[in-house]
Amino acid sequence: MNTELDMQNFEHIKFLENQISEDHFRWKKNSKHLYNLLITRTLTWPSLSIQWLSAMESITEKAVLKNRLLLGTHAAEGMPNFLQLADLDLPDFNQTILDPVKHYNEDTGELGGYSMQHSCKFQISQRILHNGDVNRVRHMPQNPNIIATMSSCGNAYIFDRTKYTSMPAEEFLPNISLIGHKKEGFGLSWNRQQNCRLVTAANDSKILEWDLNNFSRDTRCLTPVKDFHYDDSPVNDVEYHPHHTNLYIAVNDNGIAFICDNRLQQTCSKTVKASNPLFSVRHNPSIATLFALGSEQDLQLWDLRNLNKSVFNTSEDLSDNRLKVPSRLTLGGTSLSWSWRHSGRIVSACQEYCYVWNFNKANPLEFVHAGHKGTVNEVDFDPFEAQCIASVADDNELHIWKPNVIVN
């Protein structure tokens, strides 16, 4: 046992914890100047995943936008897990005059909504009992009532939320169980061009495609229509191309991103090799050839027309000191989300921080969100409100935030 090495590791961990506490204190002190909107809520259990629903209602007379969010739970051992639907009322920024933060609660340590006329309302409106942790949750683009999850038990599940009451039942009963993976996973993506089609990826190194049209009510189970296996490395993420029925990209622990076409006998048509394990992939919704890859060390942009060299890489741009950021920050991207309103803007999350990038600028780093005290599990851009972002972390917190100050 190397006592000296253990002590060095302990001191390094304590240093990082103190640094995070100092960063969070400064963030809380300055938050009133940094955001047009900031909502923080402490959840009962951490959520590993978050997604805005693609349906929103505008209440014009109240200047309110009624949104919904999908969340999960990562409960303690022996405690039940739930798929959760949350209602969120936000101010309509086109009708409301915004004011700096006035609603910080000293007792709870929570920040509320920041408009002059409205407080933002958040509540869990529906909970559905789930088998295992909700590793990932996504709704069908063509029908937001149909929800898919990836579970820590290895299976994927489909729920029609209209078939469940607001309070959870005592028995776990999904509408469909997707049977095929042998280990847990986090890769999950619906096909935006083909109704009822989705793809999953897991630690068993498999990528499976599913067609819900093949579902039989007699068994309530479904087997995959396609099975792809590249190597023995865990596949961490997968996403269909938003404008193409047959294309998707997946990434794995070996740092390989494989571009796949399910019409081909050899499904993988091209690959990109990174120097670190890859955890996230996202296609740009506006630029058909552009996609982003994220690892714990860097964020990379690639163009499908030229896979010989990345368009942008944070580790390379840091080496020439073009990005003016503290050296302790790791500009990786274990979770990524492109803006639906601005083609050059993406948010990445790594460790306790979220980074907003605008690649239409010479210095692309626009904003750093330092409000979380635990590792950020997932980030998601609001599809309706430009620059509004949701993030969830291991500190049990959900943050809804819209930056006010853009740092150049």
Swiss-Prot record:
Task: Please state the protein's primary subcellular location.
Answer: cytoplasm
Cellular compartment(s):
Cytoplasm; Nucleus
Tell me the SUPFAM superfamilies matching this sequence: WD40 repeat-like (SSF50978)
The record's Gene Ontology biological-process terms are: DNA repair; DNA repair-dependent chromatin remodeling; DNA replication-dependent chromatin assembly; mitotic recombination-dependent replication fork processing
Is Cytoplasm given among the entry's keywords?
yes
**What's an example GO cellular component term for this entry?**
nucleus
* Record-given protein name: Histone-binding protein pcf3
Q: Which organism is it from?
A: Schizosaccharomyces pombe (strain 972 / ATCC 24843) (Fission yeast)
